[in-house]
Swiss-Prot record:
It catalyses: hydrogencarbonate + L-glutamine + 2 ATP + H2O = carbamoyl phosphate + L-glutamate + 2 ADP + phosphate + 2 H(+). Residues 402-546 are annotated as: Oligomerization domain. Mg(2+) 1 binds at residues 284, 298. The gene is carB. Mn(2+) 4 binds at residues 832, 834. Large subunit of the glutamine-dependent carbamoyl phosphate synthetase (CPSase). CPSase catalyzes the formation of carbamoyl phosphate from the ammonia moiety of glutamine, carbonate, and phosphate donated by ATP, constituting the first step of 2 biosynthetic pathways, one leading to arginine and/or urea and the other to pyrimidine nucleotides. InterPro entries: ATP-grasp, ATP_grasp_subdomain_1, CarbamoylP_synth_lsu, CarbamoylP_synth_lsu_oligo, CarbamoylP_synth_lsu_oligo_sf, CbamoylP_synth_lsu-like_ATP-bd, CbamoylP_synth_lsu_CPSase_dom, MGS-like_dom. ATP 1 binds at residues 129, 169, 175-176, 208, 210, 215, 241-243, 284, 298. It comes from Leuconostoc mesenteroides subsp. mesenteroides (strain ATCC 8293 / DSM 20343 / BCRC 11652 / CCM 1803 / JCM 6124 / NCDO 523 / NBRC 100496 / NCIMB 8023 / NCTC 12954 / NRRL B-1118 / 37Y). This is Carbamoyl phosphate synthase large chain. The large subunit is composed of 2 ATP-grasp domains that are involved in binding the 2 ATP molecules needed for carbamoyl phosphate synthesis. The N-terminal ATP-grasp domain (referred to as the carboxyphosphate synthetic component) catalyzes the ATP-dependent phosphorylation of hydrogencarbonate to carboxyphosphate and the subsequent nucleophilic attack by ammonia to form a carbamate intermediate.
């Protein structure tokens, strides 16, 4: 069936900001889809609210809108552009829900716009719990006994009849939001109430728990001619009961018999055909480990996180194929781009094992609940490929960047065998290390299986790793043992630790004995057909399949898994660097370990090495490829941390020299630069002991900002106000400082602002100044940011520009640099310099139309900015106003305090742009899913230090017609200042309290601040949690409230009596 000629203009809906449950995989799928449709000659319009994405680059679509993903704004775009069709299945749950809402609002029918790929009826049959249940019953496919509940009573009645535990799954939500496993009446009441609140259709599925069954996933494709194929089968290491996004996953399936695979494969194909989906579907199933009994758990009628994993695991580009199928092409017409010869109807075959481990944010959030269940908590993931499972597993472990190179790097010496065994359930993020430690102690596989229900096959693989550790220990220096350990994924560093040597010693020994990796191709056909995919993984075998080009090459290091502080912004910069390298005539090589990202799409670079970003793995690729240089500036702290060790091994680092990179991070060296340039800087000192830190803080004067050096995302950064707080911090945080000292600065109260600088050592270009809305003390990644600045004086702007130019020259910056300032008493103080691409690069690149990462790469390759037409100084401002706003995932991490501070907590960002600040702010709030009410009740509960400022804000709310609620202390202050206010009781005193008011939907906005020494105060924390749980806008910084009021005031009319 040829592609459709009756449509020409297609709108692709993106997935919005990165949140837990919906991350970079949708930038990858959306980018693939838009390019795929353009390739077929269609006019593509793309809408997304997230500026840190490749898909929102000008060249990806014919027209790009960075606008809120709300009905109101999408409708405006549809009326303006009049597309023939919408492709909603590549924008995650956001895109799917938007298609449903547009249809129900009658907009699609009115404008005669059709949905491509998946019909609305199929979306509803898969997403609506009642329709899904009815469909499975019609197909005679088994699902766990369940009911659809729309009330708490229905939920409790089901559990009374069927017994506990039961699983709660809300309809139309993302990453298991609002769901969970309930063991008791009380747990079920709480989870159901939360699930009904978070489901947009107020509907939850209550089902009998089948926790403990094997969890299997199939990625399936179908076209309009009813051709269908299974792209990948995947098996979760963890049994049913842990969200698949939090599960360790292997591909292909490992423990199923051929009969079981065929039985479940047939069911998957039957389901996609019954739903009549044209494109890709993810089907999750549960298999009884002791019989052939299985259940269908869930069907995702869209490209998903698992689709991205399956695409990277097999090399089969699911999103690209889904886009072509959506416009009428069939699988037997589409060429598989991997082989270039076979058709897309061939099912991929794997001659390797893939191992995925999620990346959780618990290193950032020490208070978070590390137990895993049906609600996803991971921010990202890593994938590794090996010839056996042990190899893939250990490569994945060292890709995580959690301080573990092997399974022996995290141990539990403080716990007895019984205590450690008990800690295995409920499962935690570190269960793989717990299992390894138990096996190391001699606890049997059977005992661990009985406790966890993890299949014995997987446990046996972990045991094999432990046995190799023990064999290495008893055969120190044995070359055969070394070779065998390398074949099974052991890092040089692990072997060195066991043998009492250094990793460099092991590397030298390996090279002497010709023990080195070869690189195998990921080709979708298990080497059965000729293939030319430039996509490789390392293994210790004989034949090397990576052919070295005669062209000069440049290696770009990616940023590894997505985590808080190091998000998709760095992948954006990596992809742009590759484009610039290719345009300069070099071969561009990417090395990365993240299956979700655009950078690990094999069509982006000339060569892709899907490998861990460790010194050993990077050096192995360099040994083979011999690039002219390595780019570390775009891979966040991951790549920067490799710069010095690579240089020590004779590798050429492109751009700013390693010596200058280190100068920016070394406090004393950096202070020297600041002194030489005579730049204002907060008083600061360095401390290496607790006593030293106390003396420093006392001499500077409290409050002080304290942090370890060499850190990303403000990890372990705090504002402390007393000796006691400082001592507490030093005990908790010095451990994370990597033998680097702790930095202590005077905490200056004032507004923050920042610039990115592009420099070639002679010319320093500043594309724009970004002014933060929140004052210093809130991490820059968690602040709302405005370009061009609206309130900074010209004097301050001039100071920032001149200081940044001087710093770029003094630091010999070749490429990018980020400088952060605090504006105190109308003077710009330098507070931080990052000698690399920062997380603001995509935002400032979009709003100034300057591809900063590409320009920086050209500079690193020797071009001069003057030759490109640039001169030193600030680029003229844009005539629009742009606001970057942070996005948080607190609903997924209920134990993490939502109070903002110097430690970064946001997972993503959105952008709002318009002709003035209030309109841009409005868009940013809407894109952030912050409701902007026209009227209602505002709850104030603020610290004593903030009461005077809060009074002015309360007056503004009152003038707009909002009613004021407050807790006792704040209420008394507002009342004493003649404002009408309803005072609420303490939570422990009566039911007339703030938490009850939130649960009863009586409050539309919450404003809560605390004293620096009162972070753990009980009522404030409970109020913040209640606001998050009930989706009520919560503000913990008064500057954000003022911006919010600016929006409310701009959208309202004033009514005043004349007499």
């Amino acid at each position: 069936m040829p592609k459709r000629q009756d449509i020409s203009k297609i709108l692709v809906i993106g997935s919005g900001p990165i949140v837990i449950g919906q991350a970079a995989e949708f930038d990858y799928s959306g980018t693939q889809a838009a390019l795929s449709l353009k390739e077929e000659g269609y006019h593509v319009i793309l809408v997304n609210s997230n500026p840190a994405t490749i898909m929102t680059d000008a060249e990806i679509a014919d027209k790009v809108y960075i606008e809120p993903l709300s009905i109101d704004f999408i409708e405006r775009i549809l009326r303006k552009e009049r597309p023939d069709a919408i492709l909603p299945t590549l924008g995650g749950q956001t895109g799917l829900n938007m298609a449903k809402d547009l249809s129900e609002a009658g907009i699609l029918d009115e404008l005669n716009i059709e949905l491509l790929g998946t019909k609305l009826s199929a979306i509803e049959e898969a997403e609506d719990r009642e329709e899904f249940k009815a469909l499975m019953e019609r197909l005679n496919e088994p699902i766990p006994e369940s009911i659809i509940a729309t009330t708490l009573e229905e939920s409790l009645n089901f559990a009374d009849t069927h017994g506990y535990p039961v699983i709660v799954r809300p309809a139309y939500t993302l990453g298991g939001t609002g769901g969970g496993i309930a063991q008791t009446h009380e747990e079920l009441s709480e989870i159901t109430a939360n699930g009904l609140e978070l489901s947009p259709v107020t509907q939850v599925l209550i089902e009998r728990s089948i926790a403990g069954y094997k969890e299997i996933e199939f990625e399936v494709m179908r076209d309009a001619n009813d051709n269908a194929l299974v792209v990948a089968s995947m098996e979760n290491f963890d049994p049913v009961g842990i969200h698949t996004g939090d599960s360790i996953v292997t591909a292909p399936v490992q423990t199923l018999s051929d009969r079981e695979v065929q039985m479940m494969r047939d069911a998957a194909l039957k389901i996609i055909r019954a739903l009549k989906i044209e494109g890709g579907v993810n089907i999750q199933m549960a298999l009884d480990p002791d019989s052939y009994k299985y259940y269908i758990i869930e069907v995702n009628p869209r490209v998903s996180r698992s689709s991205a994993l399956a695409s990277k695991a097999t090399g089969y580009p699911i999103a690209k194929m889904a886009a072509k199928i959506a416009v009428g092409l069939t699988l037997d017409e589409i060429i598989n781009p991997v082989t270039g010869t076979t058709k897309a109807e061939f099912e991929p075959a794997l001659d390797y094992v893939v191992f995925k481990i999620p990346r959780w944010p618990f290193d950032k959030f020490s208070t978070a609940d590390r137990r895993l269940g049906t609600q996803m908590k991971a921010t990202g993931e890593v994938m590794a490929i090996g010839r056996n499972m042990e190899e893939a597993m250990l490569k994945a472990v060292r890709s995580l960047e959690i301080g573990a190179i092997g399974l022996d790097d995290i141990t539990y010496k403080d716990l007895s065998d019984d205590e450690l065994l008990a800690a295995l359930m409920p499962a935690r993020d570190d269960r793989l290390f717990m299992i390894a430690d138990l096996l190391r102690r001699g606890v049997s596989i059977e005992t661990i299986h009985d406790k966890t229900l993890i299949n014995e096959f997987f446990l046996d693989k972990v045991l094999h790793v432990i046995e190799i550790e023990q064999d290495l220990a008893s055969h120190v220096g044995d070359i055969d043992q070394l070779q065998y350990a390398k074949k099974n994924g052991f890092a040089d560093e692990t072997i060195a630790k066991i043998w009492g040597k250094t990793a460099a010693d092991i590397r030298t020994l390996r090279k002497d004995k010709k023990i080195k990796p070869v690189y195998k191709m990921v080709d979708t056909v298990a080497a059965e057909f000729e293939s030319a995919t430039p996509y490789y993984y390392a293994t210790y075998e004989q034949e090397n399949e990576s052919i070295i080009s005669t062209k000069k090459s440049v290696l770009v290091l990616g940023s590894g898994p997505i985590r808080i502080g190091q998000g998709v912004e760095f992948d954006y910069a990596t992809v742009h660097a590759v484009k610039a390298i290719q345009r300069a005539g070099y071969e561009a090589i990417i090395m990365n370990s993240n299956p979700e990202t655009v950078s690990t799409d094999f069509s982006i670079s000339d060569k892709l090495y899907f490998e861990p970003l460790t010194l050993e793995d990077v050096l192995n690729v360099i040994d083979l490829e011999n690039p002219v240089g390595v780019v570390v500036q775009f891979g966040g702290q991951t790549a920067i941390n490799l710069a010095q060790p690579l240089l020590d091994n004779g590798v050429n680092i492109l751009g700013t020299s390693v010596e200058d990179l280190n100068r920016a991070e070394d406090r004393e060296a950096f202070d020297q630069v600041i002194k030489e340039l005579a730049l204002p800087q907060p008083v600061g000192k360095t401390a290496t002991t607790v006593d030293c830190a106390l003396a420093a803080a006392q001499s500077i004067g409290y409050p002080v900002l304290i942090r370890p050096s060499y850190v990303l995302g403000g990890r372990a950064m705090e504002i402390v106000s007393s000796d006691d707080e400082l001592q507490d911090y030093m005990q908790r945080a010095v451990k994370v400082s990597n033998d680097h000292p702790v930095l202590i600065d005077s905490y200056l109260v004032g507004q923050e602002a920042e610039v990115d600088v592009l420099s070639d050592g002679e010319t320093a270009v500043i594309p724009g100044i970004m002014e933060h809305i929140e004052r210093a003390g809130v991490h820059s990644g968690d602040s709302m940011s405005v370009y061009p600045p609206q309130y900074l004086s010209q004097k301050v702007q001039d100071e920032m520009v001149q200081a940044s130019i001087n710093l770029a020259k003094a630091m010999n910056t070749i490429g990018l640099m980020n400088v952060q300032f605090v504006i105190h008493e109308n003077t710009a103080y330098v507070i931080e310099v990052n000698p690399r691409a920062s997380r603001t690069v995509p935002f400032i690149s979009k709003v100034t139309h300057l591809p900063l990462a590409q320009l920086a790469t050209r500079v690193m390759l020797g071009e001069k900015l003057s030759e490109m037409g640039f001169e030193t100084g600030l680029v003229p401002n844009d005539d629009m106003v742009h606001v970057k706003a942070p996005i948080f995932s607190f609903t997924k991490l209920p134990d993490v305090d939502s109070l903002l501070g110097p430690e970064m907590k946001s997972t993503g960002e959105v952008m709002g742009s318009d002709i003035n600040l209030s309109k841009a702010l409005y868009k940013a709030f809407i894109a952030s899913n912050i409701k902007v009410p026209r009227y209602g009740n505002v709850l104030f509960t603020v610290a004593d230090d903030d009461k005077e400022e809060a009074l002015e804000l309360a007056k503004r709310f009152n003038d707009l017609g909002f009613a004021l609620f407050a807790t006792a202390g704040t209420g008394a202050y507002l009342s004493d200042n003649d404002l009408p206010v309803e005072v609420l009781d303490k939570i422990s005193e009566s039911d007339n309290n703030a938490v009850a008011a939130l649960r009863q939907q009586k409050v539309q906005v919450v404003i809560n601040t605390t004293q620096a020494d009162d972070r753990a105060e009980s009522d404030g924390r409970l109020i913040r949690n209640a606001a998050i749980e009930n989706a009520v806008p919560l503000f913990t910084a008064l500057d954000t409230v003022s911006a919010f009021l600016e929006v409310l005031e701009s959208r309202s009319f004033t009514v005043k009596e004349m007499h």
